């Protein structure tokens, strides 16, 4: 990730999000936005939970207090699943390509390629 020209590792964000018990998994990408890049965090929550403004704020506060303001996502979006390779690694590039309307290569290497559909044409990412 490179918002405002500052290099940020996604692992720094994931380490903070792991502290939020409501979140099962997350994936962060850089979305091209307004001649820059903004951080977008997708979260898979525990069953039966919905992403509220309070939970979004809790996630942002944990990230901000343990990293830098640049690490704080501009958007947090709930998804039902996060795509992974057959070996279990989350696939940030595939999600980034879906968000940007670009083709995703090598979907045969994904354990759950159907999860990619959750990242296409999200209204939350159009403003």
Placement of each model-derived feature along the sequence:
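Adenylate-forming
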Residues: 1-18, 42-53, 67-75
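Short acidic amphipathic segments
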Residues: 17-26
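Conserved C-terminal "lid"/linker of ANL adenylate-forming enzymes
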Residues: 25-32, 40-41, 60-127
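N-proximal, solvent-exposed segments at the start of the mature chain
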Residues: 36
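Positions that flank functional sites
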Residues: 16, 32-33
């Amino acid at each position: 990730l490179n918002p405002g020209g500052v290099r940020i590792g996604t692992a720094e964000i994931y380490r903070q999000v792991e502290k939020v018990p409501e979140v099962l998994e997350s994936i962060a990408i850089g979305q091209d936005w307004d001649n820059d890049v903004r951080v977008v965090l997708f979260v898979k929550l525990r069953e039966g939970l919905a992403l509220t403004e309070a939970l979004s704020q809790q996630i942002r506060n944990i990230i901000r207090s343990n990293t830098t303001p640049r690490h704080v996502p501009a958007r947090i979006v709930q998804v039902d699943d996060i795509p992974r390779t057959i070996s279990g690694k989350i696939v940030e590039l595939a999600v980034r390509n879906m968000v940007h309307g670009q083709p995703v290569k090598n979907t045969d290497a994904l354990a759950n390629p159907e999860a990619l559909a959750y990242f296409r044409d999200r209204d939350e990412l159009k403003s």
